[in-house]
């Protein structure tokens, strides 16, 4: 058993080098998430009379805005690591060393899902206003893909040797090389694989959302527009509060890692607010007796 456990370690962030181009696992995982998300969202959108072209037009906007939001959110709380002498970095491209601001090096990690959710939601709101689409219906068909994409994307943390938890001797412990350990834990070798916990949690959320969606289109459960999105907010945030408590690299509001002593873990605070928002949203949706979405394509198939 110990021999099997010892192999649970990252093979490295880089998948392959093609000349001067380095293909990283994180990029591959994001690409896979996007492709699966596009296919799934288009499929679910057909049940709510959302034209596939709408999802296709939205996806690149959503991807870019989410990546920007995720990076901006992270850098905002970690600005000291990118300011001063660390402001500039160099990338190798076509045999050249090109100077760029270090906060643009997203391939080295340093993104926050809450930033992606905030900026992604803003982009969906603006898109739906311009395209005259029903915001809640569009959001409902996207959140299952978001949950699945998070489950896949979290493995990027594994390959980058980041976002791990406290030291542990559990059978599922994760080996972290010395160069990736925080100084205060340099004498420890095995840590909680918090990326794995969140990945599994997100898979469960994805399955729950798909199950509820299917019950809804079959008329077995009343799920007004927006309810699925609120359920996602609540379920994801509940898991994130617990998982974030295990991590030793949190973004802190006051205090400092690994325990944010004298301060708060920002992800836990945001998650708590999202639970409140999602709970209020569900109450409002059912209290106001919002209309059920129109499942035109399903009914057409039954004829």
UniProtKB/Swiss-Prot annotation:
Q: Which residues bind a 1,2-diacyl-sn-glycero-3-phospho-(1'-sn-glycerol)?
A: 154
Location(s) in or outside the cell:
Cell inner membrane
Q: In which pathway does it act?
A: Protein modification; lipoprotein biosynthesis (diacylglyceryl transfer)
Keywords of this protein's UniProt record, alphabetized? Cell inner membrane, Cell membrane, Membrane, Transferase, Transmembrane, Transmembrane helix
Q: What is its main location?
A: membrane
- Give the top-rank taxon of the lineage listed in the UniProt record for this protein: Bacteria
Keyword Transport annotated: no
Which Gene Ontology cellular-component terms appear in the entry?
plasma membrane
Output one GO MF annotation: phosphatidylglycerol-prolipoprotein diacylglyceryl transferase activity
Q: Which GO terms describe its biological process?
A: lipoprotein biosynthetic process
Write the Enzyme Commission number(s) for this entry: 2.5.1.145
InterPro entries from the UniProt entry:
Lgt
Give the transmembrane region(s): 18-38, 50-70, 106-126, 193-213, 223-243, 266-286
| Membrane topology according to the record | Multi-pass membrane protein
What general EC class does the enzyme of this chain belong to?
transferase
A Pfam match: LGT
For this protein, the record's NCBIfam families field holds: lgt
Which HAMAP family does the UniProt record give?
A: Lgt
Reported function:
Catalyzes the transfer of the diacylglyceryl group from phosphatidylglycerol to the sulfhydryl group of the N-terminal cysteine of a prolipoprotein, the first step in the formation of mature lipoproteins.
> Into which family does the record put it?
Belongs to the Lgt family.
Query: Per its UniProt record, what PANTHER family does this chain match?
Result: PHOSPHATIDYLGLYCEROL--PROLIPOPROTEIN DIACYLGLYCERYL TRANSFERASE (PTHR30589:SF0), PROLIPOPROTEIN DIACYLGLYCERYL TRANSFERASE (PTHR30589)
Protein name (database record): Phosphatidylglycerol--prolipoprotein diacylglyceryl transferase
């Amino acid at each position: 058993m110990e021999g099997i456990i010892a192999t649970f370690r990252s093979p490295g962030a880089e998948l392959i080098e093609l000349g001067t181009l380095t293909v990283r696992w994180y990029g591959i995982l994001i690409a896979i998430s996007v492709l699966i998300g596009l296919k799934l969202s288009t499929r679910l959108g057909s049940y709510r009379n959302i034209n596939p072209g709408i999802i296709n037009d939205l996806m690149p906007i959503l991807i870019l805005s989410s990546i920007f939001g995720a990076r901006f959110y992270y850098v905002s709380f970690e600005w000291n690591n990118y300011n001063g002498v660390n402001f500039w970095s160099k990338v190798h491209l076509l045999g050249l060393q090109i100077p760029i601001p270090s906060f643009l090096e997203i391939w080295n990690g340093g993104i926050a899902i809450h930033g992606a959710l905030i900026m992604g939601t803003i982009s969906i709101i603006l898109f739906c206003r311009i395209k005259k689409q029903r915001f809640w219906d569009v959001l409902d068909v996207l959140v299952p893909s978001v949950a699945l994409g998070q489950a896949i994307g979290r493995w990027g943390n594994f390959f980058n040797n980041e976002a791990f938890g406290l030291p542990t001797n559990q059978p599922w412990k994760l080996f972290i090389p010395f160069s990736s350990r925080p100084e205060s834990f340099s004498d420890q070798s095995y840590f909680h694989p918090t990326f794995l916990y969140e990945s599994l949690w997100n898979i469960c959320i994805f399955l729950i959302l798909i199950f509820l969606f299917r019950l809804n289109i079959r008329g077995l459960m009343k799920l007004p527009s927006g309810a699925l999105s609120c359920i996602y907010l609540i379920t994801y945030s509940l898991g994130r509060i617990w998982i974030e408590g295990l991590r030793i690299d949190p973004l802190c509001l006051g205090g400092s890692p690994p325990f944010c002593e004298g301060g708060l873990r920002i992800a836990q605070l945001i998650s708590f607010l999202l639970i409140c928002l999602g709970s209020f949203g569900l109450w409002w949706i059912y209290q106001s007796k919002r209309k059920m979405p129109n499942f035109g394509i399903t009914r057409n198939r039954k004829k």
